[in-house]
Amino acid sequence: MSEEVKEQNLPEVEPVQEAASDSVNLDALGDISKVEKLEKELGEITDKYYRANAEFENIKKRYEKEKADVASYANEKFARDLLPVIDALEIAANFDPEDDEFAKKIKEGILITINQFKKCFEKHGVSEIATDADFDPNVHNAVLRVDSEEKQSGQIVQALQKGYMINGRVLRPAMVSVAN
C-alpha cells in the first residue's frame, strides 16, 4: 500500500516539478527582461553622463577663452585713451625746426617719446593698422574719395589718422582717403 501511495505520488510530483521549472523559466525570462531594461537604463545614464561631461568640458574651455580674452583686452580702454596723446606727439614731430638747435633737440625728444610709446604698445599687443594696401572696411574708415593717378580705385591714397588694433581687435579704425 505504501508502494501504491508512492507510485501515485510520483506522477503528481513530476508535473508539479515541471510546473515549478516552467515558473522558474518564466521568472528567468522576467529576470532577463529586467536585466535588459536595467542595461538599457544603464546605457541611457552612461550616455547622459558622457554628454554632461562633454558639456562641462566645453563650458570649461569657453570659460578659459573668456578669461584669456579679458586678460588680453584688459588694457583696451587705457590704450584707447592714449591714442590722442600719441597723435599729438606725431603732429608735433612733423614740424620743421629749420636751423634752431633748441627746436631740433625738442623734436628729437618727441621722436624718442613716440618710439617708447610704440614699444610699449607692441609689448601690450597694440599695433598700427597698415594703410599702404587696399581699403578694408573692417579696419579702415574712408572719409574722402579722391582722384588719383598713382593709385587704382579702392586703394588708400592717404592716411589722415592712424588706426590701431589690440590683439587682433580694432581699437580705432584708420581714417583714410580712397582713390575713385
From Swiss-Prot:
PROSITE patterns: GRPE (PS01071). Gene3D superfamilies: 3.90.20.20, Head domain of nucleotide exchange factor GrpE. It is found in: Cytoplasm. Keywords: Chaperone, Cytoplasm, Stress response. GO terms for molecular function: adenyl-nucleotide exchange factor activity; protein homodimerization activity; protein-folding chaperone binding; unfolded protein binding. InterPro entries: GrpE (IPR000740), GrpE_coiled_coil (IPR013805), GrpE_head (IPR009012). It holds the Pfam family GrpE. GO terms for biological process: protein folding. Residues 1-21 are annotated as: Disordered. Homodimer. NCBIfam families: PRK14140.1, PRK14159.1. Participates actively in the response to hyperosmotic and heat shock by preventing the aggregation of stress-denatured proteins, in association with DnaK and GrpE. It is the nucleotide exchange factor for DnaK and may function as a thermosensor. Unfolded proteins bind initially to DnaJ; upon interaction with the DnaJ-bound protein, DnaK hydrolyzes its bound ATP, resulting in the formation of a stable complex. GrpE releases ADP from DnaK; ATP binding to DnaK triggers the release of the substrate protein, thus completing the reaction cycle. This is Protein GrpE. It comes from Campylobacter concisus (strain 13826). The gene is grpE.
